[in-house]
Amino acid sequence: MQIAYSFKKAKVFLVLILFNIHFIYSGPVKPKDPILRLAVIGLVHDHVNWILNRQKEDVKIVGIVETNKKAIARYQKRYSLSNDLFFDSYESMYKTVKPDAVSAFNPTKEHLDVVRYFAPKRIPIMVEKPMATTYKEAQEMAELSKKFNVPLLVNFETSWYESTYEAKKLLETNSFGSLTKMVFNTGHPGPQEIGCTPEFLDWLTDPILNGGGALTDFGCYGANIATWLLNGETPLRVSCVAKQSKPDRYPKVDDDTTIILDYEKKKVVIQASWNWSHNRKDMQIYGSKGYVNCKNAKDMILMKNEQVGEKKHIPQPISEAKKDPFRLLYEVVYKDVILEPYSLYSIENNLIVSKILSLASESSKTQKTQNWK
């Protein structure tokens, strides 16, 4: 019995030794990645559902700034948001929660106010497209970002599309020849028609708060992608026809707009409308030897040889940061990711976008082509 007892003690001792050896040589426990403590600025942009619906643990909403009681009640009920998340001013929210970053879902006209308040505090900022209602506002936002060395991102839905990135890769192979034309068709049947919330409609259809109608709402997509594909090249001239097809519904702003960007050796046509028969964000890119047709986020059609004809093409998968703007914001804050100049979210790109939209607006009012100055 004594021998059996001693053997058991020896086994226990051996197990303890092996455990300690494993603990010593397995190295330190890897710390958990930090959580991005995000403040949401505004609930009156229906895109806010993107962050409220997001079911990932790397980003946590720690504060919401909103004064619209109807919007607050709607989203509190839909997402079971606690009362202590809500604040009625930037200042009260900032003093209470000290967020790591802010994401703006307020009227475009108020983007500048967000940057004016949070940039001096060196809080990274992401706003919804477009960057601003005027080029002058966009310039001030860019200057504040540079002065305080704080990231400023502009979020477009098409920046999450696999087809968008695949199109650039295909163009860089030169297998479609030299680029000659790009056509962007963006929009939907109309904000009222698709059921936008009243709070969203109030400012989306206001020429001051939104900077225009379909021109700014959907003209920005084509300008953004074209600027990226052309590596920051600017057009020589901007022409625009902005119409009111439904003045009874949208009496203050345009609802069906065509923008033409004239470059030295190529042309870009942007058809931005609240009068399409269906939702669409598609683009056709034409080269001297063929074309790339991005029908939506994932479906593509290519043609390199007319005799062979068209063929379907499946885009390559993209990284999580490209598919998810909030993951990109996380990596900008915690992984020191720096946006490339003229990339889709970048200030450089969106300054050009803002100037294009401003010149397009002027062209539609004067009925004259505007030169790039």
Regions of interest found by a model, annotated:
Residues 2-13:
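Bacterial N-terminal signal peptides that target proteins for export
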Residues 224-299, 327-339, 359:
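Contiguous beta-strand/loop segments that form the cofactor/metal-binding neighborhood of enzyme cores
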Residues 140-158, 180:
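Rossmann-fold dehydrogenase core element
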Residues 13-22:
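Bacterial N-terminal signal peptides
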Residues 28-32, 101-104, 332-373:
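C-terminal helix-rich "cap/oligomerization" subdomain common to oxidoreductases
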Residues 46, 161-249, 367:
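Predominantly a Rossmann-like dinucleotide-binding segment in NAD(P)-dependent oxidoreductases
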Residues 21, 25-80:
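N-terminal Rossmann-like dinucleotide-binding module
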Residues 71, 81-144:
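Beta-loop-alpha module in the N-terminal Rossmann-like domain of NAD(P)-dependent dehydrogenases
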